[in-house]
């Protein structure tokens, strides 16, 4: 069957659900697709379809990231359902890095939990520009004063981590109520909170200014072989435009730079003439084997970015209370540096006269990675150790 062409008639926004495990992120995602489907603006995706990798079902927690799409009157949304479990925060980082805005899901009976804090902190680190809160399971709360208290606590928490806590819309509702409703009338009360939430997302999360005019760059998230067609890499275009036929370079995870041409671009299984900044696309590459490319590399306009191993870094080291280290580290410390879509081990050098770094410190250091990756001034990264984030940083200067 011939593929449909993707219609670009509304602004496109990448959004995602974040929050503590079992607070209702996946239920809400399903409820949004259901409510929008009743208005003819989405395909309904059931809970099981979103929570769909094999290991997820067995343990009842979302591990991988699911993509759904829906529309409101004003916009087209690509929605990622981000993992909520602390062990899988690494995936959370890959998801949060792809967001123009986030829906923070908080269970009203439970209030903010450790992962709620960690996700707000991470959203700040990876610079999610705006957030809307869905206060879920309010049907399980009888006391309106308790609801007010949970809301106040949330606003304080958001403010603490650098978000405008007083301004952020908090929508109260029940995702399960909407998902379980037998009614096919979208104006019924059980769908009201979902409509309100989408209105808040439409109004409060700004349409991002896409970096369309900058040179093309796309971090590679995944690589597939398609029989008879070649190798496809997927990811979200960080900046610029890629057109079918463009020559591009594959950079990172080693010193060599490969040159290839893009022979096809797809989004949501539909063909595009070009992919633009902010689009989640698959790009078909000419003459490239499945083994020639890997997650962590980038596709880029020739000459626009180079692989580097050594740079200066301005780093904030998380406190113990924020989920960071309990003890200091010293020169020669070798954590993982989470750059764009992958972890790379690197050694840290501290400035002269600084013997150790304490949790909570802000410090400038030098970093030397064990393999070159595509790095440029202003690049943000996370520092991770044993599966948890211990710091966040930015590259003010490249050394080598």
Swiss-Prot record:
It catalyses: GTP + H2O = GDP + phosphate + H(+). InterPro entries: EF-Tu_GTP-bd, EF-Tu_GTPase, EFTu-like_2, EFTU_2, G_TR_CS, P-loop_NTPase, Small_GTP-bd, T_Tr_GTP-bd_dom. It comes from the Bacteria. Residues 136-139 are annotated as: G4. It is an enzyme of class 3 (hydrolase). Residues 60-64 are annotated as: G2. GO terms for cellular component: cytosol. Mg(2+) binds at residue 26. Residues 81-84 are annotated as: G3. PANTHER family: ELONGATION FACTOR TU, MITOCHONDRIAL, ELONGATION FACTOR TU-RELATED. Belongs to the TRAFAC class translation factor GTPase superfamily. Classic translation factor GTPase family. EF-Tu/EF-1A subfamily. Monomer. This is Elongation factor Tu. It comes from Herpetosiphon aurantiacus (Herpetosiphon giganteus).
């Amino acid at each position: 069957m011939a593929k449909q062409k993707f219609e670009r008639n509304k602004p496109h926004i990448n959004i995602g659900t974040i929050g503590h495990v079992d607070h209702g992120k996946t239920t809400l995602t399903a409820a949004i697709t259901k409510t929008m489907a009743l208005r003819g603006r989405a395909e309904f995706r059931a809970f099981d379809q979103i929570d769909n990798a094999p290991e997820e079902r067995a343990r009842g927690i979302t591990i991988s990231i699911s993509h759904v799409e829906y529309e409101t009157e004003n916009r087209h949304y690509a929605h990622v359902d981000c993992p909520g479990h602390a062990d899988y925060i690494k995936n959370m980082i890959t998801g949060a890095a792809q967001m123009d805005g986030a829906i923070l899901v908080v269970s009203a009976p439970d209030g903010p939990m450790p992962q709620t804090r960690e996700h707000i902190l991470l959203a700040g680190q990876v610079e999610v520009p705006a957030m809307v809160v869905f206060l879920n399971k309010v049907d399980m709360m009888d006391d309106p004063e308790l609801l007010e208290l949970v809301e106040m606590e949330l606003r304080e928490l958001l403010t603490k981590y650098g978000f405008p806590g007083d301004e952020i819309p908090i929508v109260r509702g029940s995702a399960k109520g909407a998902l379980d409703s037998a009614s096919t009338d979208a104006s019924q009360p059980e769908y009201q909170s979902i409509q309100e939430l989408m209105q808040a997302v439409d109004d409060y999360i700004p349409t991002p200014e896409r970096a369309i005019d900058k040179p093309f760059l796309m971090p590679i998230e995944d690589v597939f072989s398609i029989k008879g067609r070649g190798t496809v890499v997927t990811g979200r275009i960080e900046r610029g435009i890629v057109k079918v036929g463009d020559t591009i370079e594959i950079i990172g995870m080693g010193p060599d730079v490969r040159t290839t041409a893009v022979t096809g671009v797809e989004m949501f299984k539909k063909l595009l003439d070009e992919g633009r900044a902010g689009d989640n696309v698959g790009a078909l590459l000419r003459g490239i084997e499945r083994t020639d490319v890997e997650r962590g590399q980038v596709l880029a306009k020739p000459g626009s970015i180079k692989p580097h191993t050594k740079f200066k870094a301005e780093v904030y080291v998380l406190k113990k209370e924020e989920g960071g280290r309990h003890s200091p580290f010293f020169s020669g410390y070798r954590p993982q540096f989470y750059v764009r879509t992958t972890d790379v081990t690197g050694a840290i050098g501290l400035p002269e006269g600084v013997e150790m770094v304490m949790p909570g410190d802000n410090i400038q250091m030098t970093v030397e990675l064990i393999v070159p990756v595509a790095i440029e001034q202003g690049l943000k990264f996370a520092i991770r150790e044993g599966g948890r984030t211990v710091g966040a940083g930015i590259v003010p200067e490249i050394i080598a």
